[in-house]
Each structure stands twice: as structure tokens, then as C-alpha cells.
Amino acid sequence: MTFDAAAFSVFDVDGLDGRMEAIRAQLWPLFNKYGRSIAEHVQLRLELEQPLFVHVAKHLRRTAYAPESTWVAIGGDKRGYKKYPHFQIAINAQYVAIVLACIDNPLHEKGIAADFSSRASDFDDLSFDYVLIADHTRVSYEALSEVDCKGFFERVASVKKAEWMIGRVAQPGSAELALNGISFKTKTCVFPMTVRTINIKIFVREVITASKTDTTIDNGNFAMIAVINENI
């Protein structure tokens, strides 16, 4: 996907109004393009009847400070995405991140974390360039290979405001950000795990069975995670 110098330059613009104008001009077209592409791909791979929703961050609650990062989320429902695990393309002054995100205390967060913790060794199958972002409000990240995944997800399951994003990052000027469109290589950044890794499809069925009285559950929102098992 193409995020060039102009895309990163939005973070050089001072002030909320000026930066938002730059974000709308430079980034929203990219977010809509790549967000729809990912949504269509996931829907096709999982044979979902309903399309995945694409939510471009509007930052409407901001009244003074310019956003230091911005993003598009793929998943959730018509009203939003934060209460569901979702895919996300995010950009800040240092990198573009393509991740699976579980932030802002989504539905079944503790169950997901407990399942991930019990299968922590499966993360060893991921390639060396995977990262963990433990706070979506900060730019810092850790190489996933250096993280105690079992301990980390045990903490997520027990701490109310714990969160995580797992995926890959690409710096300005990198080959990954110079591609025209979402290529095969970039798709592997979004849907990267092999069939040997975490079998979320089993967990999905368990969640839905255990929570069948919760009318907010949409199978597509959880099935979206299952695509990570695919080696596309």
C-alpha cells in the first residue's frame, strides 16, 4: 500500500483544524481504499453474508489538541468498532501499523485473552517482524518474539484496562509502503498466521455458545479473527 512522504507530512501541520484538514485530504482516501479492500477480502475468505464495516477515525471529540495518530478500523457494527476485536491500519509520524486490535475493553476481552494465554506457544510460529503494541495511544512497540505472551495475556485477562494490538509496522520510505494497492505481501501483513497457529474458530463457537443470550453478538465480528489462521 502507498503511504508516501505527503501522508506522513500531516503530522508536521500544527493545530487541530489544520491537521484534520490535512488528514482528510491526504489520509482519508487511502483509508477508505485500503479499508474497503481488506473488508471485501475478509468477507470473501470467510463467506460472510454481511459485509464488514469500515470506520475511518473522525476525532470528533477533540477540541484542542491535534491527533498524533489516526486510523481506519475494519469490523464492528454500524455504530462503531471499539467494542469488538477489529483490524486496523494506523499511521503516526514514525510508522504505519497493520494490526489486529483489541482495545478499549471490547466484548469478551477476558475470554479472548485467556484463550491466547493458554496457547501462547503458538505465537512462536509467527515471523520475526511481528510486534506487540500494548498501548494504542503510544508509538512504542515490542518485538513479539521478545514478549512473554503467556504472562502478557494473563495480565490482559486480569487487568481492566489492559489492551493489545498485534501485527507489523512499516517505516516511512520502506518498500512495503511504496506498493500500489494492497499486494500479496501486504495481505500477509494483515492475515499472517499459518494453519498451525491459534484456532480461533473453535474459540468463536465457544464464545457464541456460552453467550447465546447476548443479542449484541454478531458471528462476523468474531469470525473476523479466524481469518488470521489463514496462510494467504
For each of these PLM feature ranges, what is it?
Residues 208-223, 227-232:
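Ser/Thr-rich, low-complexity intrinsically disordered segments
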Residues 97-145:
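Compact, glycine/acidic-enriched structural inserts
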Residues 71, 129, 163:
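A residue-level signal for beta-strand positions that form part of recognition/binding surfaces
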Residues 1-86, 90-97:
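Charge-rich, low-complexity N-terminal segments
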Residues 1-46, 138-208:
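Long, solvent-exposed, polar/charged low-complexity segments
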